[in-house]
């Protein structure tokens, strides 16, 4: 399984919705798929699954707003 698919799987688990896989350009915050608690859960899941630490202070909703953008940000950090 490639990195993008793995990230989308984690995101779908946290959001409890497969739409993030079907439409990787969906605005996850605007659509109510992720909130502040979900953000923390996502960052912990990313750290546990990929061993990538993303400090909450580095998580900007305007940058991490779509599944594709999340994959891109994590690709830069890994």
Curated annotation (Swiss-Prot):
Q: Does the keyword Cytoplasm apply?
A: yes
Recite the UniProt keywords alphabetically.
Cell wall biogenesis/degradation, Cytoplasm, Phosphopantetheine, Phosphoprotein
Q: Where is the signal peptide?
A: none
Q: What is its main location?
A: cytoplasm
Q: Which GO terms describe its molecular function?
A: D-alanyl carrier activity
PTMs per UniProt: 4'-phosphopantetheine is transferred from CoA to a specific serine of apo-DCP.
Compartments, record wording: Cytoplasm
Residue stretches making up the Carrier domain: 1-78
InterPro entries from the UniProt entry: ACP-like_sf (IPR036736), DltC (IPR003230), PP-bd_ACP (IPR009081)
Biological-process GO terms, alphabetical: cell wall organization; lipoteichoic acid biosynthetic process
* Any one cellular-component term (Gene Ontology): cytoplasm
> In the record, which positions carry O-(pantetheine 4'-phosphoryl)serine?
36
The pathway entry for this protein reads as:
Cell wall biogenesis; lipoteichoic acid biosynthesis
Tell me yes or no: is Membrane among this UniProt entry's keywords: no
Relate the protein's function as given in its record. Carrier protein involved in the D-alanylation of lipoteichoic acid (LTA). The loading of thioester-linked D-alanine onto DltC is catalyzed by D-alanine--D-alanyl carrier protein ligase DltA. The DltC-carried D-alanyl group is further transferred to cell membrane phosphatidylglycerol (PG) by forming an ester bond, probably catalyzed by DltD. D-alanylation of LTA plays an important role in modulating the properties of the cell wall in Gram-positive bacteria, influencing the net charge of the cell wall.
The similarity annotation says: Belongs to the DltC family.
Tell me what this protein is called.
Answer: D-alanyl carrier protein
Please give the organism: Bacillus subtilis (strain 168)
């Amino acid at each position: 399984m490639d990195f993008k698919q793995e990230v989308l799987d984690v995101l779908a688990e946290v959001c409890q919705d497969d739409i993030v896989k079907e439409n990787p350009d969906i605005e996850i915050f605007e659509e109510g798929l992720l909130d502040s608690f979900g953000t923390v859960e996502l960052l912990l899941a990313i750290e546990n699954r990929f061993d990538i630490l993303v400090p909450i202070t580095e998580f900007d909703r305007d940058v991490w707003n779509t599944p594709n953008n999340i994959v891109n940000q994590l690709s830069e950090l890994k």
